[in-house]
């Protein structure tokens, strides 16, 4: 049995941190699909390509070489792991990620990666689209306020100046866009295990997932 693990959920739910730790526990490759959409957003903004300029966006993606290296995302030889987390990228990523052609191209790349290795993959549409046949699917959620608090702490720890209210408003806005877009909206897979981590620490969520999987394999 392929040990592919899909972890979905809204912005700031802790998907990346938890997925990374789960991957380490089972010695699997970790693929952060959200980082890939953020990278496209970053590169598009650098070149002043708008989200509605589909042809230029597609050409841009074709020119990008993306791979993960020790939890870092390398794009055309550049480590963009820190820059893609900046507020400017966060505020625009939903607009670019909602473009059909962008999602088609990145989903193709993500499926290709998962076809080569057993993976832990996190995002918005992993359990429903990218790894819809994954044997293990989880949907992480938490209140918008708790998610904003976590993101604020994460960015502040990296000495990035941010405002809690701005983060909260951005999370609420992204929740709406991600859940209502026409292409692969954020939805919980029917066979996914839902985990509300509002009152759970990271270790508790990781332990729950690891124990759940360990009992099945």
UniProtKB/Swiss-Prot annotation:
SUPFAM superfamilies: P-loop containing nucleoside triphosphate hydrolases (SSF52540). One of its GO terms (biological process) is pyrimidine nucleotide metabolic process. Keywords: ATP-binding, Cytoplasm, Kinase, Nucleotide-binding, Transferase. It is found in: Cytoplasm. Gene3D superfamilies: P-loop containing nucleotide triphosphate hydrolases (3.40.50.300). InterPro entries: Cytidylate_kin, Cytidylate_kinase_dom, P-loop_NTPase. One of its GO terms (molecular function) is dCMP kinase activity. Pfam families: Cytidylate_kin (PF02224). GO terms for cellular component: cytosol. It catalyses: CMP + ATP = CDP + ADP; dCMP + ATP = dCDP + ADP. Its EC number is 2.7.4.25. ATP binds at residues 9-17. It comes from the Bacteria. Belongs to the cytidylate kinase family. Type 1 subfamily. This is Cytidylate kinase. It comes from Clostridium acetobutylicum (strain ATCC 824 / DSM 792 / JCM 1419 / IAM 19013 / LMG 5710 / NBRC 13948 / NRRL B-527 / VKM B-1787 / 2291 / W).
């Amino acid at each position: 049995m392929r040990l592919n693990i899909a972890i979905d959920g809204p912005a700031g739910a802790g998907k990346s941190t938890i997925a990374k730790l789960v991957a380490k526990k089972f010695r699997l490759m970790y693929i952060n699909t959200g980082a890939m959409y953020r990278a496209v957003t970053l590169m598009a903004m650098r070149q002043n390509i708008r989200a509605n300029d589909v042809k230029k966006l597609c050409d841009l993606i074709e020119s990008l070489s993306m791979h993960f290296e020790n939890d870092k995302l390398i794009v055309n030889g550049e480590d963009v792991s820190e820059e893609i987390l900046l507020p400017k990228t966060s505020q625009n990523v939903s607009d670019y990620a909602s473009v059909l052609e962008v999602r088609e191209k990145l989903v193709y790349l993500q499926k290709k990666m998962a076809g080569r290795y057993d993976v832990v993959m996190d995002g918005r549409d992993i359990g429903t689209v990218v790894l819809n046949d994954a044997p293990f699917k989880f949907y992480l959620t938490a209140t918008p306020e708790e998610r904003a608090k976590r993101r604020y702490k994460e960015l502040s720890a990296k000495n990035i100046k941010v405002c809690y209210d701005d983060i909260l408003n951005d999370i609420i806005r992204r929740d709406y866009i991600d859940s209502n877009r026409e292409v692969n909206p954020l939805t919980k897979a029917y066979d996914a295990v839902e985990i509300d981590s509002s009152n759970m620490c990271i270790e508790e969520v990781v332990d729950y997932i690891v124990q759940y999987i360990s009992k099945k394999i």
